[in-house]
Amino acid sequence: TKYQRFDDGVEHLPTGWPYDMAKSCFSKHSCHMGVVKALKALAEIPEEKRSNAVNDTIEKGIAYMLIHHIHKRSHDLNRLSKPGWIRFGFPLMYQTDALEVLGILTKLGCTDKRMQEAVDLVISKQDDLGRWKLESTFNGRFHTNIEQKGKPSKWITLNALKVLKNYYN
């Protein structure tokens, strides 16, 4: 929890390791994907085993994602953080999308109204049979392909249903 940043843009960047490396992740604005992946890892720690530092980091990560309404730019909520964040994929590897972020936040018990637009996005992508399509894929980069892009996805459907259940219950 020591190095993950949750700022929304700073004038004076931190220096030293690891900030002097990977400038794309440690530039003036915290890396959205880095925040999401840190939250994803910390959410797996059972609540009773989380240290105060872990809980503080989780709270900062949640707050960071909420000021961005999950998939928007905090300084202009009419713009997406990244266009790919509204195309649902599995597995995501280092990438992320609004569905993954919602899954992490709802797993952590968060159901803030600033999540609603992203939840509505999930609902809007459900087909008439209650399924969701695979819209983004790393197929061709693995030893085997995971489902077929553009077709209904068991994994996206499972994740979407879990998000909706956790958000509305």
Residue ranges with predicted function:
Residues 121-125:
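A structural feature that tracks compact, well-ordered secondary-structure segments
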